[in-house]
Amino acid sequence: MDWNELEKIRLAKVEAMRSEDIEPYPTRSEVDQTIKTAIIAFEDFEKQSEPSINAPQAILAGRIRSKRVMGKLAFCHIEDSSGRLQLMLRVNEIGQGGLKEFDERFDLGDFIQAGGSLMRSRTGEITLLVSEYKMLAKAITPLPAAKDEIVDGKVVHHATLSDPETRYRQRYADLAVNDEARNIFRTRTAIIRALQRFLDKHDFIEVETPILQPIYGGAAARPFSTFHNQLHQELFLRISFELYLKRLLVGGFDRVYEIGRDFRNEGVSFKHNPEFTQLEFYMAYADYEKIMGLTEQMLATVCDEVLGKRTFIFDGQEINMDIPWRRVELRQGILEATGVDIYAYPDAEALYQAMQKAGLNPKEGQPRGKLIDSLIGDFLEPNCIQPTFLYDYPRDISPLAKNKPGNPQIVERFEGFVGGMELCNAFTELNDPLEQEKRFAEMGRTYDADDEENHPMDEDYLQAMSFGMPPSGGFGMGIDRLTMLLTGNRSIREVILFPYLRDIESEE
């Protein structure tokens, strides 16, 4: 590695410590509790009517986040994943040599172990009065930037990082210095756990299905492909869990769900990442109406558990997740927004001409399904700020959904929108193997062989359906987008620990 001048200074400290047989990266620590636990123990000690003579003792560890040395006294703040605490180092306890060593060898970003007794400083801050300490890990590279803060009349230097590109590329540094970033991912974890609790409570079982698949399906997207050398077989990273989860319905599991990664070889945007986390569940003997109700309950419960309320601010607007959500029939919604009645134009060319006449600037040469998708994305989705279900979709764009009784051109499908973006997608599942085979064939004829919307024929899935699949409802939702909403972030990169980024060399 090429080291800059500041890093060379820290490397010299590493060499100096080792020359004195002091290991800057020891194998073990003697930590006996977290910072949060120590603070709680001290607060309990203070509440005692007749406190014991000796204050609580603790051996703590953390990253040094601030540091100041003043004559025979030094202060620093350390931080672990549970909280932050001030350390006080005095000549009385550690000697002049100990204070000198701390001053000269410890820098912001270093991990320190400190033992001593808990107390309150003159300003009332809970503090560990250090009687012994040691280096746990020397940080050679300084934390990315610095800001100053006045504490007790003294200037304290704190590490921070704000440049978005650097934060995404060096997420480890971002997490090390930004509380806000860590809180986003704590919230993300809380969201996933709340979803699991809700589904478990409703008798769903969590399962795992293949990530490497011989045939991709369950969504309209271009897959990533790979090759198994020993089997001489092309494989695909899954774009959806759907077809495998529905095989489990055939096998007798009436309520199943999976939370995991999907991979789609498509564009990157503020709300799209090629690798993303998805929740899908399937429920036997349910239809899309029942799934709508379950969706409302589930997301209201998640808000209650994660936020403690059902309202939050997203993109400057207050969103209210109370039940029930607004419901808009898709045909009527498009008609009111654009003046185009999509069911009056049963083929792509007729719909294209109608959109042209209405001044909607459609893209030429698109299948009818893609034209309808563009109407939804351009004219309905941005206006669905409060939770909204768009329902009853054309069969053209829903090859796995069941027809609405009495209308073979419409399927029982809904999409949920919140904050002006799609959050979830669900439908009454098609369980007729003959109709499903016909739909797969139609998709193959409608789109070119290399089109991303082309849905390959999955013979094994059809075989599974032929054994009998119960009537059911299915649901899919992006965990990343839900996290965006509940943390108030407009960019998906903010809620994925290591988002996809273009190589720096290719940018140059």
Across the structure, where does each feature detected by a protein language model lie?
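Class II aminoacyl-tRNA synthetase catalytic cores and aaRS-like
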Residues: 1-508
